[in-house]
Structures are given as C-alpha cells and as structure tokens.
Amino acid sequence: MKRIATPSLTSRLLVAARSGVSPATAAIRSRSAISVRSQSTAALAQHDASHDLNNDRFPPLEPLPPAAESLPSPLPERALTSAKLAALHARLNLSPKIPLQTLARTLVDASADENPQFNNANLAFVGQTLINYHIAEWLLCKYPRLPQGILFSAMKAYAGPKPLLQIARSWGVDTAAVPGGEVDPGLLQFDALKPGVAITNFGYKRTELAYLEKFKWRRGMASRVVLDDDFGDVVRSDPKVAADLEKAMEEQDQDKTPDEEEAEMVANEQDQDVSYDRYGNPDTRAAAERAHAYFVRAVVGAIYAHCGREAAKAFVKAHIMSRTLDIAKLFEFKYPTRELAALCAREDFEPPVARLLSETGRQSRTPVFVVGIYSGSDKLGEGAASSLDHARFKAAMNALKAWYLYSPGENPRVPSDMLEEGAKPWTPAYIDMGEVISR
C-alpha cells in the first residue's frame, strides 16, 4: 500500500481537526508562523544601517536643560540655534551689530515673563517714544494746519496698536500657543489670559475714568493734550483701581428699579453672546494686538540701543511712515459752512459766497448740482450733489480740507534732521495757529 504525499499545510489542518481546533484558526496560526520565520538577521542588519544613516543626516535635537521647561521664557543662549530667529533677522535686514539674543528678547512679552531683564518692556518703551516722536514731527511739518484731533487720529493710524499688528504680521512673525522655556525663541510669546505689566505711557490717569466711560462725558481738546496719551486716548488705570471704581459705582446704582436691572442683565447677556466667536473674545484679541505692537516697538528700541539714532529713524521711515494713509478721510465736519465763515473772518478774507456753477436734470429723479464757494474772486472749493444744500455743504467741506491739508512739500525738513553731521542751518517750520472751531 502506497502512502499519499500531502502538503505540510494540509497535514497541519488534519492535525488541527483531530485536536479540536477549527481549520480557519489553524490557517491563521500557520500564516503568522510563516511570516515570523521568513524574517532573517540580514534584514535586521539592513534596517539598523538605514536607521543609523538617517541619524547621520538628521541628527536628533539637543536635549533641553532640565530646568528649561519650568522657565517662563527660553534661555538667551538658545537664540543662537533658532532658525526662525535667524530668518527674521535677515528678513528685516537688521545690522550685524544687533545680536540674536536681543532680537529674541523683543519677542518675549511682559505677560509671558514678568522679569524686566528678559522681557521687551524697556525696549518697547524706548521704541514707542522714538516712533511717536518721528511721526509727530513729520506730520506737523508736512501738514502744518492739521487740527489737533485729526493729528491724534493720524498718529494712531500710523503708530497705533492695529497698524503695528499688521506690520508685525507682514514680517512673518508667528505666535506661540503657550509661553514657556521650551518654546522656540523665534516665536512671539505672550499670555492671552494675563494682561502682564504695561509699559509706562505719557499722560495722567484720570480719577473720573469710570464715570467718563459710563456717562460719556465730553473731553475737551485741551484736556486731551495735557492729560491723555500720545494719541489723545484716556490713560487706563490699574486693574485694581478700576475694579474699586466699578464697585463704588455699583453701590451707587443699587437704587435701580427691577425693570432697569432686568434690562441691564439682558443687555449684558447679549454682549457676552456676541463677544465670543471662532477667533476668541475681545480680551484675547486685544492681548494679541498689544503683544504684536510691543514687539514692533521693541525692535525699534533694540535698533536704537545697538545701532544709534539714525538707524532707528531710517527703520521707522522704511516700515511705518512709508504706509499710505488718506488723511482727508479722517475729517468729519458738523457745521462746514459756519466753520468756513469763521475761517475767512479770522484770515481777513471776504465772506464766502456759494454760487451755482452748473446743473442737470432738475426735474428728473437724479438731478446733479455743482456748487462753488467763492471768497471775492477766489474759488475756495467745489462740490456736486443731488440737492443744492448738500452740494453747498460738500463745497464748504472741500474748501476746509484744502485749507487744513496744505503741505509745503513731500519731504519737509524736520527738527531731528539737525542732529545729523554737517546739517544745514535750521529754517523754522511754518506751523498754523490751529483749527477754527474746537471739537
């Protein structure tokens, strides 16, 4: 009797059937065994060699010091190995005199690290002073007849927190999710939930600030110049002082009727619902805006500290003053005809007279009237609108804008030009006596 030659797999299935194991389970075990046996020592050696090759090409990162994670900001020596920081230094075309450690310090906000020796508060104060000074002297010499309120608005449009935020983003600066010692020094580090230490601003803190915001008291231009900051805005009090004032106001408001309290609660709930969206709440957005603005100011302060006055002025001109701003859109007149009449009386001009220059479609749905404002034989302004009164108002507004936006030239000399070596003798700049009607 001849034996039948069966494959090894079939024999294992037969053995499994005798032992009570299902054929499917036996097949799976056999496949796993086959796959395990197919591996060899040569394959393992080849895998280890490729792993070593990758380590040679891409070495692992250097381990951080044991106490780095507990620090509020990265160590200064880590700035020398940051690719982001080196790229930012080259992108801004900074001088080699500015070390990477100083540039890394400009990226550490006071809310991330409260130590003034490691954050950018001091550099930001120097930079803020330089930026506001150069922009103020340039605006005053270029537009000597600007009203004080428009001057404040123009300065804020150039050097306020929002334009500085746009400048920082145009530089390609990324933000860290959470500040700490393990963060890359090339990232902007700030705490969105903690206000931090604000830099010192010029101006005085009003004791009536809480009542000023609640009752919308009017602030005169003289008080804005003397008491408020460089942009004519109210200098905010410390959080503790503001909380005490708010608590005192709440105690005075205890005599409200139930209907008034219910209406106020509904309004507060609506404000809370609107304040939170996909981009955070107003507090976190304000913290990010403030951190970016402090960073730009700190960069200017670092340039001044390491490279001098002229380098800082050139940087401000290239990155801040070069931005386009239509100052004519900042004007808002309430009584343009009365203000124009007062201006003509102050300057000893003949009283302004409105004259109809041309018209079309008076009896149609879309008439157009062109009105000109004349002082004697001199034409002061011209405006077109769908009604005679509106055209007269537009002509008066255009005449006032033409007066206030007078400029002696595109690049006038400023007082800081006298600090240069070999500067020409100073010629006093023309500065107008100011606006006609104070707003």
UniProtKB/Swiss-Prot annotation:
<keyword id="KW-0694">RNA-binding</keyword>
<comment type="function">
    <text>Component of the mitochondrial ribosome (mitoribosome), a dedicated translation machinery responsible for the synthesis of mitochondrial genome-encoded proteins, including at least some of the essential transmembrane subunits of the mitochondrial respiratory chain. The mitoribosomes are attached to the mitochondrial inner membrane and translation products are cotranslationally integrated into the membrane.</text>
</comment>
<dbReference type="InterPro" id="IPR044443">
    <property type="entry name" value="Ribosomal_mL44_DSRM_fung"/>
</dbReference>
<feature type="region of interest" description="Disordered">
    <location>
        <begin position="247"/>
        <end position="282"/>
    </location>
</feature>
<dbReference type="GO" id="GO:0005840">
    <property type="term" value="C:ribosome"/>
</dbReference>
<keyword id="KW-0689">Ribosomal protein</keyword>
<dbReference type="GO" id="GO:0004525">
    <property type="term" value="F:ribonuclease III activity"/>
</dbReference>
<feature type="region of interest" description="Disordered">
    <location>
        <begin position="39"/>
        <end position="73"/>
    </location>
</feature>
<comment type="similarity">
    <text>Belongs to the ribonuclease III family. Mitochondrion-specific ribosomal protein mL44 subfamily.</text>
</comment>
<dbReference type="GO" id="GO:0006396">
    <property type="term" value="P:RNA processing"/>
</dbReference>
<dbReference type="InterPro" id="IPR000999">
    <property type="entry name" value="RNase_III_dom"/>
</dbReference>
<protein>
    <recommendedName>
        <fullName>Large ribosomal subunit protein mL44</fullName>
    </recommendedName>
</protein>
<dbReference type="GO" id="GO:0005739">
    <property type="term" value="C:mitochondrion"/>
</dbReference>
<dbReference type="GO" id="GO:0003735">
    <property type="term" value="F:structural constituent of ribosome"/>
</dbReference>
<feature type="compositionally biased region" description="Acidic residues">
    <location>
        <begin position="258"/>
        <end position="274"/>
    </location>
</feature>
<dbReference type="GO" id="GO:1990904">
    <property type="term" value="C:ribonucleoprotein complex"/>
</dbReference>
<keyword id="KW-0687">Ribonucleoprotein</keyword>
<dbReference type="GO" id="GO:0003725">
    <property type="term" value="F:double-stranded RNA binding"/>
</dbReference>
<feature type="compositionally biased region" description="Basic and acidic residues">
    <location>
        <begin position="247"/>
        <end position="257"/>
    </location>
</feature>
<dbReference type="Pfam" id="PF00035">
    <property type="entry name" value="dsrm"/>
</dbReference>
<keyword id="KW-0496">Mitochondrion</keyword>
<dbReference type="InterPro" id="IPR014720">
    <property type="entry name" value="dsRBD_dom"/>
</dbReference>
<comment type="subunit">
    <text>Component of the mitochondrial large ribosomal subunit (mt-LSU). Mature N.crassa 74S mitochondrial ribosomes consist of a small (37S) and a large (54S) subunit. The 37S small subunit contains a 16S ribosomal RNA (16S mt-rRNA) and 32 different proteins. The 54S large subunit contains a 23S rRNA (23S mt-rRNA) and 42 different proteins. mL44 forms a heterodimer with mL57 and stabilizes rRNA expansion segments 1/2 at a membrane-facing protuberance close to the point of attachment of the ribosome to the translocon in the membrane.</text>
</comment>
<dbReference type="InterPro" id="IPR036389">
    <property type="entry name" value="RNase_III_sf"/>
</dbReference>
